[in-house]
Swiss-Prot record:
Keywords, sorted A to Z: Acyltransferase, Plant defense, Transferase, Ubl conjugation pathway
SUPFAM superfamilies, A to Z: Acyl-CoA N-acyltransferases (Nat)
Renumbered residue ranges of the record's region Disordered: 496-549
Name recorded for this polypeptide: Arginyl-tRNA--protein transferase 2
Low complexity compositional bias, start-end: 496-513
Highest classification ranks of the organism: Eukaryota, Viridiplantae, Streptophyta, Embryophyta, Tracheophyta
GO molecular function: arginyl-tRNA--protein transferase activity
Length: 605
């Protein structure tokens, strides 16, 4: 290969930051199929497809931001002006997210489940998941709340008693070491549960404050009383402050050992017990990439009183029989699929296979721009007492976490695991932005305004929709009036609709459905390859042939190995073949954009 050709190949590899190598795509052309959303019997769902087995995370990020999505190794983009159900890419800036009342209830429902106050119910025992939380708390449940509260308090008493005893032991150690006088009658320690209203008074940044003890204050008072009784003693000179006493007690407790499930701190003379988060890296063989597998005992980290343990594990996309069995149960129970329609092959093709090149968290110049888990495709497992109850299929990219699919155990349908997993994924983006500053967004896939099952996506506010023409992000509240009028709209034409026409009051009318956050209907899972890739004969060949050839001159093409710009490829002897190729390249450039057409490698097949 000449130096010029080598340079051309290197340009493609390095143009997106030098991570992940190069992207290679094959154009599948236009595809017409029946629609899984409007359930049309005719082939009115129209999209353009690409096949790829190698795609960099940067290039996929750029494709997402121009309306593409992936199903396994197949990339597809709706032809918005022609398809029956225009699909708009929807995203949310994680740092701006404001949970709705219903989303907060979903979190509380999980908390109650983990506390043992609420049992999960299977699909047949639950009503529509968009019912309000007040309907779940029936009259009979309300009558039992008092008893449940008393039971919970009884469970917490041994914890407070144990913490009190540990403080008492620390007091004795301070006396033995001479830090506290031995002739002082020191009272027994008392530990109390902290309620949210009092947390800010006791400590700054005390969202996770669970228990507190003010033992330092009676100790100081007892010392003062004893010293006052001793004649000739300079009381002020020898007096310890509550802050100093609590620090000495904390030091003594730390020498004994760590408090399981708690972080102990002192503030304003109080000894505070905060919840602790346990984060561990997954065990791995030598040479295996670090996956940043995170174990979270519960969403609020209340390790002490949980009857059930919730854990989340992030792992690279791979086939696991346990996940496949859960997927089969989910498809049959929730989507009413027949067992014979589900196969290991289709499951792998849909949810395991990925073209994304793995990017580990180390080994690159811009390590500070890569999260600890790296970039690529992942499965997020949710386990309750080690039982797999849900799996979220996600892509982690330079600018976002893209949610692809979620399947869950039908026995846990009442917990709204789709909504809960979305909230967890939003939290993940917030937490990891500290390490990867570019990772700001949560992508929820496609939004179809006419599909009621999609409405829950717009309930994650403030969300944005991608304009299908200019690829600009438009606030949902601005886009909604346009979509109310017609399914396809150039959303960036905001001059026609005042942003004030969509009021906050109007936005409250959105149905906050708890339909699980899935990007595709079941039809996308079991489509035969022949149907998916069947290119429509109604092409744009006539119009494309009249386009200026210079538009496609810099498209990077693979010719059985070598990478060449189209302008460097010798002309074909057959003008018909030349015309067909140029027509294909014009169409390809149109759907992926000029920039990506010169970066990704176009593979001729």
């Amino acid at each position: 290969m000449s130096s010029k050709k080598a340079k051309t190949k290197n340009e493609a590899s390095s143009s997106r930051g030098g991570i992940g190598g190069e992207s290679i795509v094959a154009d599948c052309g236009r595809n017409k199929s029946t629609c899984g959303y409007c359930k049309s019997s005719t082939r009115f769902s129209i999209s353009h497809g690409l096949w790829t087995e190698r795609l960099t995370v940067n290039d996929y990020q750029a494709l997402l931001d121009s309306g593409w999505r992936r199903s396994g190794c197949y990339l597809y983009k709706p032809e918005m002006e022609k398809t029956c159900c225009p699909s708009y890419t929807i995203r949310l800036k994680a740092s701006d997210f404001v949970p709705s009342k219903e989303q907060q209830r979903v979190r509380r429902r999980i908390e109650r489940f983990l506390d043992g106050e609420l049992d999960a119910k299977p699909s047949e025992q639950t009503e529509d998941q968009d019912v309000s939380f007040s309907r779940e708390v029936s009259v009979s449940v309300k009558k039992s709340l008092g008893a449940a509260k008393r039971e919970k308090n009884n469970e917490l008493e041994p914890i407070m008693k144990d913490l009190s005893e540990q403080i008492d032991n620390a007091v004795q150690k301070c006396i033995q070491s001479g830090e506290f006088p031995s002739n002082v009658q020191i009272p027994k320690a008392s530990v109390k549960k902290v309620f949210s209203a009092k947390r800010k008074k006791l400590a700054e940044g005390s969202e996770d404050l669970l228990y507190t003890s003010n033992i330092a204050f009676p100790i100081v008072a007892a010392m003062k009383h004893t010293q006052t009784l001793e004649k000739g003693k300079n009381v002020e000179e020898n007096r310890l402050s509550p802050e100093a006493v609590s620090e000495k007690l904390l030091s003594a407790m730390n020498k004994v050992g760590e408090f399981t499930g708690f972080s102990v701190k002192v503030s304003k003379g109080h000894i505070n017990f905060l919840s602790a988060t346990q984060v561990t890296s997954s065990d791995r063989n030598e040479g295996e990439e670090s996956l940043c597998a995170t174990t979270i005992k519960s969403s609020s980290n209340k390790l002490h009183a949980r009857k059930r343990k919730l854990e989340m594990h992030l792992k690279r996309s791979s086939f696991e029989p346990e996940e496949y069995e859960l997927y089969k149960r989910y498809q049959m129970k929730v989507h009413n699929d027949k067992p014979e329609s589900i196969s290991e092959t289709s499951y792998k093709r849909f949810l395991v296979d990925t073209p994304l090149t793995e990017v580990p968290s180390s080994g690159y110049d811009d390590e500070e721009k890569i999260p600890l888990c790296g970039f690529g495709s992942f499965h997020q497992q949710y386990r309750v007492d080690d039982r797999l109850i849900a799996v979220g299929v996600i892509d982690i990219l330079p600018k976002c976490l893209s949610s692809k699919y979620l399947f869950w155990d039908p026995d846990f349908a009442s917990l709204s695991l789709g909504n809960y997993s979305a909230l967890q994924e939003i939290d993940w983006v917030k937490q990891n932005q500290a390490h990867c500053s570019t990772l700001e967004y949560y992508y929820l896939g496609y939004y179809i305004h006419s599909c009621n099952k999609m409405r829950y996506k717009a309930a994650y506010r403030p969300s944005e929709l991608l304009c299908p023409l200019r690829y600009q992000w438009v606030p949902f509240e601005v886009a909604k009036p346009l979509l109310d009028k017609k399914p396809y709209s150039v959303l960036s034409n905001i001059s026609k609709v005042s942003s004030s026409s969509s009021s906050p009051q109007a936005s409250e009318t959105l149905l906050e459905s708890t339909s699980e956050h899935e990007d595709m209907e079941q039809g996308d899972t079991n489509d035969d390859d022949d149907e998916m890739y069947n290119s429509d004969e109604d092409s744009d060949s006539d119009s494309s042939s009249s386009r200026n050839r210079s538009d496609i001159t810099n498209i990077l093409i693979s010719l059985n190995g070598p990478r060449l710009r189209y302008k460097d490829i010798p002309r074909f002897k057959n003008p018909v073949v030349q015309k067909q190729l140029e027509s294909m390249l014009v169409s390809y450039r149109k759907v992926v954009g000029a920039e990506l057409s010169e970066i990704m490698v176009y593979e001729l097949r």
